[in-house]
A protein has these predicted regions:
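Membrane-interface "cap" regions at the ends of multi-pass membrane proteins
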Residues: 1-54, 59-64, 77, 81, ...
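Helix-loop-helix junctions that connect adjacent transmembrane segments
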Residues: 26, 66, 142-147, 176-311
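Extracellular loop-to-transmembrane helix junctions
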Residues: 49-145, 151, 262-272, 445-455
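TM-loop-TM module centered on a large, flexible mid-protein loop between adjacent transmembrane helices
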Residues: 98-99, 105, 137-141, 210-215, ...
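Helix-loop-helix connectors at the membrane interface of multi-pass transporters/channels
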Residues: 101, 107, 128-150, 184, ...
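Membrane-interface loop-to-helix entry segments
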Residues: 147-204, 259-263, 382-395, 421-425, ...
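C-terminal membrane-solvent junction of multi-pass transporters and transport-like membrane proteins
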Residues: 173-176, 346-358, 393-442, 470-473
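A generic transmembrane alpha-helix motif of multi-pass inner-membrane proteins
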Residues: 383-389, 418-487
């Protein structure tokens, strides 16, 4: 075997394996299995994602949106499985950045990390932009552009303060938010089922799932592809818990398990919720004309108060997602700076007394606030987020597949069966998504992607060690020291 092929993630303790991969432990390893699960599930935020983007599928093909969700969501799950194996083989902070760097070279790895970092930041910004009108609507308040930007910036600041204080605070907040969301959403789902089965409201039959209810004129192929973007918006951010690998106990096993469980759980729960929403829905045109389609559907079924409760849970879930995305984005920057591959690397790689890369956290906040200036192009911001994620993970999947064929990938504690078929399938799917996203809006999304690529080239060109290998010296931190269970 060549490269890292002789390494075995199953046989070595966390910190010892990290040193075999070329890094000294620097972060505090406190996170357990549930925290790793909560980070991944919190990133996906299936309820928040569905509530705020349900119209994406509905406007494309009407009730038939259920089938693109099932099929495209299943393909997203295959990507999740493959990324889980990659993070099991390489349980290193930085996720895709480090994995692609080792398998595809320093330049490609850095660019992949850059794209995913931008996706995390854009998603943080778009989540906060989406939350503001809903929260203010509860109090009968509406804002103009600059008011919206200011309110979104305030939410980003709250997320930043949670993240910069300590890993313990951020993970406890995420854990609590995930538990509350899971319990309450399960109860609401039971309520919807009971209302549909025993209430007086009419229930659509299964044949309704095979109609477009007047939303499609002509060929259905492109509308189905556009509807398939909904699960790609909701079910994404696959390596987020992998970014916290150096802060997770038994990371080679805990992280992939958390990733798989969170993604499969989100997919399953999302499928049930979307099915119930479609069956409970009235006229598609009325639903699309409403301010909040999901609340509009649920209000006559559950009553106004329970429908608003569901909306509140979606808000909680989406804010939890924002907190986790900022946490993950800061770890990508920290990992690149540890390798001395960012301008001001010493600042980005510095850790505060709680072993948090605080400068990186504040920079993600600053860029996210700047992104909110694009709030009038909210849909474009979401599309840019997804296309950057898809591009980054597509590169990760390709390098991982080639590495496995060459025998240069460490033996992972979690492995995908049938990988010779599954990996190429996910690569083709990722390429298809890129084409659909750019074709749908070539001027803004295509140009935005080009700008992101060029900006990455510029930043990489001025990085102090763009041609160097990995930096294995100790941390540049406020309080240097090896990883430990400091609970």
């Amino acid at each position: 075997m060549s490269g890292d092929g002789a390494l075995d993630a199953r046989q070595t303790a966390d910190d010892a394996y990290l040193e075999e991969l070329g890094y000294k432990p620097q972060l505090s390893r406190k996170l357990g299995q549930f925290s790793a699960f909560a980070l991944q599930f919190g990133t996906i935020a299936p309820i928040g994602g569905i509530v705020f983007t349900f119209a994406v599928g509905l406007v494309a093909v009407g009730p038939a949106m259920f089938w693109p969700w099932v099929i495209a969501g299943g393909l997203q799950m295959l990507i999740a499985l493959c990324v889980a194996e990659a993070c099991s083989a390489y349980p290193i902070a930085g996720g895709a950045y480090n994995i692609v760097s080792r398998l595809g070279g320093s330049f490609l790895g850095w660019q992949t990390g850059w794209w995913i970092e931008l996706a995390h930041i854009f998603s943080l910004a778009s989540s906060c932009i989406a939350l503001v009108p809903v929260i203010l609507g509860w109090f009968g308040v509406s804002l103009g552009h600059w008011g919206l930007v200011g309110a979104a910036a305030a939410l980003i600041l709250i997320s930043t303060l949670i993240n910069v204080t300590s890993v313990k605070l951020s993970t406890r907040f995420v854990n609590a938010g995930v538990v509350a969301t899971l319990i309450a959403c399960a109860l609401v789902s039971v309520g919807v089922v009971a209302a549909l089965l025993f209430g007086n409201d009419p229930v659509h039959g299964a044949d309704y799932l095979f109609t477009s209810d007047g939303t499609v004129k002509g060929s259905v192929i492109l509308p189905l592809l556009y509807a398939a973007l909904l699960p790609c918006i909701v079910l994404n951010g696959f390596d987020v818990s992998g970014n916290a690998s150096e802060e997770t106990k038994d990371a080679a096993r805990a992280v992939p398990k958390a990733m798989v469980r969170a993604n499969l759980g989100s997919y399953g729960f999302g499928t049930v919720v979307i099915l119930l929403l479609i069956l409970a829905m009235g006229r598609v045109s009325d639903t699309l004309a409403s301010v909040q389609p999901v609340t509009f559907i649920l209000s006559p079924v559950l009553g106004h108060d329970l429908a608003k409760l569901f909306e509140g849970l979606a808000v909680l879930g989406l804010f939890v997602s924002a907190v986790v995305l900022q946490l993950a984005g800061a770890r990508v920057l920290w990992a690149q700076a540890r390798d001395n591959k960012l301008p001001l690397s010493s600042r980005f790689s510095a850790l505060n007394k709680e072993y948090v890369p605080s400068f990186a956290v504040w920079i993600t906040a600053g860029v996210a606030v700047l992104s909110t200036l694009w709030s009038s192009l909210y849909v474009v911001l979401i599309a840019m987020t997804v296309v950057l994620w898809v591009t980054g993970y597509g590169v990760l999947l390709t390098t991982m597949w080639l590495g496995k064929l060459r025998g240069t990938v460490p033996t992972a504690a979690y492995r995908v069966r049938g990988w010779r078929v599954i990996f190429p399938l996910t690569i083709v799917w990722s390429l298809t998504l890129c084409v659909v996203l750019i074709y749908q809006n070539p001027r803004q999304v295509g140009l935005g992607l080009l700008i992101a690529f060029v900006a990455g080239l510029v930043v990489y060109a001025v990085s102090p060690a763009r041609n160097s290998g990995r930096n294995t010296v100790g941390p540049v931190s406020a309080e240097a020291g090896p990883s430990a269970d400091r609970s």
